[in-house]
UniProtKB/Swiss-Prot annotation:
Residues 5-91 form the Acylphosphatase-like domain. This is Acylphosphatase. Pfam families: Acylphosphatase. The gene is acyP. Keywords: Hydrolase. Its EC number is 3.6.1.7. SUPFAM superfamilies: Acylphosphatase/BLUF domain-like (SSF54975). It is an enzyme of class 3 (hydrolase). It catalyses: an acyl phosphate + H2O = a carboxylate + phosphate + H(+). Belongs to the acylphosphatase family. The keyword Hydrolase applies. It comes from Thermobifida fusca (strain YX). It comes from the Bacteria.
Length: 91
């Protein structure tokens, strides 16, 4: 399996609604490590590392319409796996 890093910036009503907690739970179910962080501009930045297929599934879930709050858009960037996380944090 190819290991990758997914960075996704999620825009919408995603702060103060349990979005980071929900993202962490989905990421851990998929065996991913990383973090979900509130940004000052109202977005949430999701960084996930692990198997490409698991990261792709997390991205699908972020765009599914089944998240807490309301997701208006998700911008993604794929880079090399760095191995810099243990577990998945809410920041």
């Amino acid at each position: 399996m190819e290991k990758v890093r997914l960075t996704a910036w999620v825009r919408g009503h995603v702060q103060g609604v349990g979005f980071r907690w929900w993202t962490r739970a989905r990421a851990l179910e998929l065996g991913l490590t990383g973090a979900a962080t509130n940004l000052d501009d109202g977005r949430v930045e999701v960084v996930a590392e692990g198997d490409r297929t698991a990261c792709e599934r997390l991205l699908e879930l972020l765009r599914s319409g089944q998240t807490p709050g309301r997701v208006d858009s998700v911008v993604e960037r794929w880079t090399n796996h760095r191995g810099s996380f243990t577990g998945f944090e809410e920041r």
